[in-house]
Amino acid sequence: IEVARRAGAQAVHPGYGFLAENPAFASACAAAGLVFIGPPPEAMQALGSKTSARKIMEAAGVPVVPGTLDAIPTPAEAADLAREIGFPVALKAVSGGGGRGMRVVERPEDVESAFRQASDEAAASFGDPSLYLERLVVRPRHVEIQILADQHGNVVHLGERECSVQRRHQKLVEESPSPAVDAALRAQMGEVAVKAAQAVGYTNAGTCEMLLDQQGNFYFLEVNARLQVEHPITELVTGLDLVAEQIRVAAGRPLSFTQNSVARRGHAIECRINAEDPAGGRFIPSPGTVTALVPPQGPGVRWDGGYEAGDEVSPYYDNLIGKLVVWAPDRPAALARMAAALAEFRLEGVPTTVPAQQAILGHPDFVDARHSTVWLEQRLALPEPSGAGPGDGDGDGGGAGGRSQEVRVAGRWYTIPRPGVESRPPARGRHGGAAGVATASGTVTSQMQGTVVRVLVAVGDVVEAGQGVCAVEAMKMESVLKSGVAGTVAEVKVAPGQPVRAGEALVVIEPQAAGPGSAP
């Protein structure tokens, strides 16, 4: 606010992070005589609490996933409620979103540990440990509706975005329109999104996120009271400038269009390019220095980036480097254009998600639109680093690497340089130990630079293979490290709050002695 005053600014646009959904900041702007380019703080307050939002939406006739309407005070009460609703369930942060402070629970015996993990993560991320509970929608699609509302009573929707390709409940690839939504369903979901905005007196840009089940039923998830990261794909298919409309609304002017004038054309896809190593499907946050960055160019290709060569990717913030977006007349052409753009993308110095996104776009399940929010982690097996070829593990996040795969899109074949991809389900538990490696000797080491947030064991504890021993956070992502062997905890080398380096030993497990009937 002080910077805005010194600059002589009249308004503040909060972007899509940090303060964008903070009602206290919006109120502080108003008190300082600055226009906050976003929704009113009252609407943000109502939607910021997920339980409050669920109550409001249920009263307004918006379909919500069965679950609790209030915070759950204890793990024991959570277990009782989960039994009533029926497993599997999802524990979620009352004050947050984006997959943080969320745990899926499939068995009663896992409720207590999941509750504590989700609560700790919610407290660290949002300053509020409160949780609520929902029935888990099995293999849903994540479909969201873009809304815009002015101060003259006009509320419109701009259709949907499909955001089902996720790891750790965070989006990696988005597209519009959704291949699972027809015109009738789009109209129904759009009507519900408009109703949700009207229920809280919403103005400016926002997104109503929903889950679409396999039977075609949809449920309210939350309203993101800000401009979304993935808004460019809506801009490309509608031809509208969402930021310009935000400024127009904040200035007190009506929207420049009506619902009937919204026309959607073609297909757009966005890949979020993150500083993560996707090898083995672990998506390990990878801070460091960007030594070279050359995004692709050409018709229908857009790059919204926040870094250039020489910039440092910090371990303390979100690891999004930029957004690669393409538009084409239809989905097959958009897939081909994105495949070509990813192959041309060049970034050196830190690993990126590009190899995973190349694998995703070439997978038959994605090409045929058979994916869901759990598809990436359950169906896509990304290779372990092999050390073979210039693109393996050298920090080159581009398409080069000496390997290629033939990918068929809409009857045409394209050669895409990228690591291999298996179209079989990965090994169970592949994603559970995302931040660490347990050696055969029982030493659990960190694979990334980060901070220990929890130690889950003590010296002398008996652990099973696959049991969590500590949690490490890096770049706003928390990962639980698991023991690779059954045995007894011999040494705990770290404490909560302690920074750790990649490769640093965290916990030492003395392996359980082999029984007489064990194989040699």
What are these regions (language model features)?
Residues 106-107, 326-328, 511:
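Short beta-strand-to-loop capping motifs
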Residues 152, 226, 239, 318, ...:
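ATP/adenylate-binding site constellation spanning eukaryotic-like Ser/Thr protein kinases
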Residues 193, 232-435, 501-504, 516-520:
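Catalytic cores of soluble metabolic enzymes centered on carboxylation/carboxyl-transfer
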